[in-house]
Amino acid sequence: MQQRRPVRRALLSVSDKAGIIEFAQALSARGVELLSTGGTARLLAEKGLAVTEVSDYTGFPEMMDGRVKTLHPKVHGGILGRRGQDDAIMEQHHIAPIDMVVVNLYPFAETVARVGCSLEDAVENIDIGGPTMVRSAAKNHKDVAIVVKSSDYDAIIKEMDANEGSLTLDTRFDLSIKAFEHTAAYDSMIANYFGSMVPAYHGESKEAAGRFPRTLNLNFIKKQDMRYGENSHQQAAFYIEENVKEASVATAQQVQGKALSYNNIADTDAALECVKAFNEPACVIVKHANPCGVAVSTSILDAYDRAYKTDPTSAFGGIIAFNRELDAETAQAIISRQFVEVIIAPSATEEALKITAAKQNVRVLTCGQWAQRVPGLDFKRVNGGLLVQDRDLGMVSEAELRVVSKRQPTEQELRDALFCWKVAKFVKSNAIVYAKENMTIGIGAGQMSRVYSAKIAGIKAADEGLEVKGSAMASDAFFPFRDGIDAAAAVGVSCVIQPGGSIRDDEVIAAADEHGIAMIFTDMRHFRH
């Protein structure tokens, strides 16, 4: 659909001034008459642009500290007026057609994110006239272009140049969708913020704001369609947050390989979030959202080599994550040794990418280096509802550990215990992790009974010929019975780290003492379902 509409008059009113001067100059140079409000009008005038204040156009001044600027029939009539149908009524009331509206809204999100933001500050940063103009222009996209993103400025000018100052209906329709997405996200933000304040507002809570609003509104942007979902008979797409604040699979750039699958993305997320837990050079290998090998060392090459040794069978077709730049030597080791679906790292050298390029099926992602973990929400869909919780960013420090056994752990046991405790947080419950000298040697995941996870971890270690004697064992939750300790002792585990909290803690501790095992309580559980 090419129905073109010339742009002869534009109304500009923006809070975010990025790029607006250049855009306005480009419009003016193409003969577009400029209308504007408040600070935007002053800025354009300072730059020497011919601009008409909306208050001069309407004959009605801005009032109430700027609360009422554009809510006027001469503004909305000019936007909503249907060309060829409402021309007579527009002419009768001296309403000039407005062909383009350039608006972005008061910075509500930035305002409420500030420490000490008052209710009054939040209220004053709720835009009224802006969303009204945006919706009016989007509704009348048949005749009017609505621009809410500065990233569209250049493309709009290029299209106008290619079409003698006009924009096509396809473009106007696309811009209208962006506009409705913009106002939906804006209203959702406001509803979420004030919805979370209801208990405090009514005196039911001393907290200024709750974590969870009474109505949860979510806005995600489609990044890509998937060939299929978790299984081939399911359709799927990948949606991301608009402003992701932490390096993640959502922000990662694919620099090589075929399109990511649904399962690739889920597994890559699991691998990346696990490797973020370590400060030393680390490697995490994941299969079906569970770590099957994790290690830290002095280099990512050695970390990969040690992680792979945990379970070479499961590593086949897995996802590999690093917390350092992927170098050529490590890339060569991976490609020479195994089939891998995805490699993700903060960055990759040119030499490394040349090596991985030899395998067209290998997907390589770079996500940038991360600083600290960003608090947020986790969601779990259930039939008819959504479970919402804070992200599990908890991790105990060495100073917070409690030794509850008669024997104290050695320095090496303590290091291994802290290492496998970090890993256990990312293994599906019931989770048991055996580790020795900064590498996993056996992982038992997702079993319905904790003792069987412990047994499986021992079996995996034995199958790979890894020495369990003197290793540490981590459990993501408490041991309900002593049988898990007995199973660990039978294969040579010498130190156990677990949350504690069972009604049979005394029996479990007694079992550790019987076997001469050092036992550490974290007082923090890490279920993962």
From Swiss-Prot:
Q: Which domain of life is it from?
A: Bacteria
Q: Check the record and name the Gene3D superfamilies matching this protein.
A: 3.40.140.20, Methylglyoxal synthase-like domain
Cross-referenced Pfam families, in alphabetical order?
Answer: AICARFT_IMPCHas, MGS
The cellular component terms of Gene Ontology attached to this UniProt record, alphabetical and capped at eight, are: cytosol
- EC number(s) recorded for this UniProt protein: 2.1.2.3, 3.5.4.10
Q: Which UniProt keywords apply?
A: Hydrolase, Multifunctional enzyme, Purine biosynthesis, Transferase
Q: Which SMART domains match?
A: AICARFT_IMPCHas, MGS
Catalysed reaction equations from the record: (6R)-10-formyltetrahydrofolate + 5-amino-1-(5-phospho-beta-D-ribosyl)imidazole-4-carboxamide = 5-formamido-1-(5-phospho-D-ribosyl)imidazole-4-carboxamide + (6S)-5,6,7,8-tetrahydrofolate; IMP + H2O = 5-formamido-1-(5-phospho-D-ribosyl)imidazole-4-carboxamide
One annotated GO molecular function: phosphoribosylaminoimidazolecarboxamide formyltransferase activity
- To which pathway does this protein belong? Purine metabolism; IMP biosynthesis via de novo pathway; 5-formamido-1-(5-phospho-D-ribosyl)imidazole-4-carboxamide from 5-amino-1-(5-phospho-D-ribosyl)imidazole-4-carboxamide (10-formyl THF route): step 1/1; Purine metabolism; IMP biosynthesis via de novo pathway; IMP from 5-formamido-1-(5-phospho-D-ribosyl)imidazole-4-carboxamide: step 1/1
Which terms does the UniProt entry file under GO BP?
Answer: 'de novo' IMP biosynthetic process
MGS-like domain ranges (all copies): 1-148
Family affiliation: Belongs to the PurH family.
- Domain comment (free text): The IMP cyclohydrolase activity resides in the N-terminal region.
Name under which the protein is recorded: Bifunctional purine biosynthesis protein PurH
Gene name in the database record? purH
